[in-house]
């Protein structure tokens, strides 16, 4: 739009007029007081490449400016929390691991910590189990952050970080497959311990994987940290300060990007995190770039923690030594492929009838958990992942509710995006890093 300037006769200064001869200030005022009917409503998603799955964003826009932004969720609802009420306590792990599918080990650990707290066996968990849990969670944190940075880069037009991120994630998933048998949703963490011990060569494989991960992490930083285009698209975008985070219950990298060093691994340690040396990464920018830098640096801290896990990993049991809670932890996979070695079967069948009955009841009915309710929480890659668990004294949960950080953090979309541009909304949502499996459950 071409403009000209005219001097006013009263000497007050200059008046900016548009090509049509109108005063520019009057044009702006007219636009601001325009009929809301001139604004349009646009649905971004649920089928859209930039909404992280089946997230629907209902946008009211005026030109390129977002005047109102609302989230539409529920397109990935699976009824997992309700299904848990019809499954044994141990079977529940198979369901919860599928909620936030990018960080399944955190779902499993939070659930198992709650069951163990109800059982009163938190202090009886073997040291080896806690080390394995911490190690798997930190490896999972790396893989989850790599996906966040890879997809975030792709959505802003940076394709190379996507390839770098997924190449690094493949290293971690291959390691998970070697240890648990599955790349994702492994149901490896169990109430009282873990499903099986590490393979004989696991320490060597993990050390090699850490060495291989350093290259893609360095490459990701080299590509984006000082990239002028990346900084222009992320700095001062998706702004949310500490007051906003506190009002909305926001946690994770979004909260730490305001300068508050809130991390449950430090403030309320679990699984022995108090025995590990690592830093809580913060920033003071309150924007998408600060959240990006936090995730990059947190991956390096996770590598430090996993290295300490390898040093702490000592031989020992991988399940609590309580026959009323856990199956025997030293089973070997027999010819039937079900973990019943001939020696174990002979011991069960050749022992007392009571032992056989107990084993049968444990397998078919599951453990009984004393009545009560607990809340446990872990620091997932997206923030505080909490579990409110209620038991009525039976073999199944009465109620299990997950406080998923993706669900809570999505509340910040309106605060981050209203008043900004449509293109910047993509940046803001990518910096939140929501996983719809955890949002809808």
From Swiss-Prot:
Gene3D superfamilies: Cytochrome-c3 Hydrogenase, chain B. Belongs to the complex I 49 kDa subunit family. The gene is nuoD. Pfam families: Complex1_49kDa. Its EC number is 7.1.1.-. Keywords: Cell membrane, Membrane, NAD, Quinone, Translocase, Transport. It is found in: Cell membrane. Its main location: membrane. It is a peripheral membrane protein. It comes from the Bacteria. It catalyses: a quinone + NADH + 5 H(+)(in) = a quinol + NAD(+) + 4 H(+)(out). One of its GO terms (cellular component) is plasma membrane. NDH-1 shuttles electrons from NADH, via FMN and iron-sulfur (Fe-S) centers, to quinones in the respiratory chain. The immediate electron acceptor for the enzyme in this species is believed to be a menaquinone. Couples the redox reaction to proton translocation (for every two electrons transferred, four hydrogen ions are translocated across the cytoplasmic membrane), and thus conserves the redox energy in a proton gradient. NDH-1 is composed of 14 different subunits. Subunits NuoB, C, D, E, F, and G constitute the peripheral sector of the complex. GO terms for molecular function: NAD binding; NADH:ubiquinone reductase (non-electrogenic) activity; quinone binding. This is NADH-quinone oxidoreductase subunit D. HAMAP family: NDH1_NuoD. InterPro entries: NADH_Q_OxRdtase_suD, NADH_UbQ_OxRdtase_49kDa_CS, NDH1_su_D/H, NiFe-Hase_large. The keyword Ubl conjugation does not apply. The keyword NAD applies.
């Amino acid at each position: 739009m071409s403009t000209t300037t005219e001097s006013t006769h009263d000497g007050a200064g200059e008046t900016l007029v548009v090509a049509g001869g109108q005063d520019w200030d009057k044009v702006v005022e007219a636009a601001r007081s325009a009929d809301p009917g001139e604004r349009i409503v646009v649905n971004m998603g649920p089928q859209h490449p930039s909404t992280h799955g089946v997230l629907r964003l209902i946008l009211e826009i005026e030109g390129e400016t977002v005047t109102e932004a609302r989230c539409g969720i529920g397109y990935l609802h699976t009824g997992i929390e309700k299904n848990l009420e019809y499954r044994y306590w141990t079977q529940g792990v198979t369901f919860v691991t599928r909620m936030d599918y990018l960080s399944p080990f955190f779902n499993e650990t939070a659930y198992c910590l709650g069951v163990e707290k109800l059982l009163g066996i938190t202090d009886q968990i073997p040291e080896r189990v806690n080390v394995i849990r911490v190690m798997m969670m930190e490896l999972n944190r790396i893989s989850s952050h790599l996906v966040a940075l890879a997809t975030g880069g792709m959505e802003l037009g940076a394709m190379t970080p996507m390839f770098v991120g997924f190449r690094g994630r493949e290293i971690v998933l291959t390691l998970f497959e070697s240890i648990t048998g599955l790349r994702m949703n492994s149901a490896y963490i169990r109430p009282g311990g873990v499903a099986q011990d590490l393979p004989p060569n696991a320490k060597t494989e993990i050390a090699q994987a850490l060495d291989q991960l350093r290259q893609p992490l360095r490459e990701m930083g080299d590509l984006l940290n000082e990239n002028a285009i990346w900084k222009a698209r992320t700095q001062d975008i998706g702004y949310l300060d500490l007051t906003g985070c506190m009002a909305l219950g926001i946690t994770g990298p979004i909260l730490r990007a305001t300068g508050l060093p809130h991390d449950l691994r430090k403030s309320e340690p679990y699984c022995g995190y108090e025995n590990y040396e690592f830093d809580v990464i913060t920033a003071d920018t309150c924007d998408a770039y600060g959240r990006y830098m936090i995730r990059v640096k947190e991956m390096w801290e996770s590598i430090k923690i996993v290295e300490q896990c390898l040093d702490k990993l000592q031989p020992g049991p991988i399940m609590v030594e309580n026959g009323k809670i856990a199956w025997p932890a030293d089973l070997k996979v027999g010819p039937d492929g079900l973990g019943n070695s001939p020696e174990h079967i002979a011991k069960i069948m050749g022992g007392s009838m009571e032992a056989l009955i107990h084993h049968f009841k444990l397998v078919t009915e599951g453990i009984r958990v004393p009545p009560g309710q607990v809340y446990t929480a872990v620091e997932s890659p997206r923030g505080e992942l909490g579990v409110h668990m209620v038991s009525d004294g039976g073999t199944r949960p009465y109620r299990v509710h997950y406080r998923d950080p993706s669900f809570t953090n999505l509340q910040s979309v309106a605060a981050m995006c209203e008043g900004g541009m449509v293109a910047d909304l993509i940046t803001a949502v990518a910096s939140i890093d929501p996983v719809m499996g955890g949002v809808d459950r």
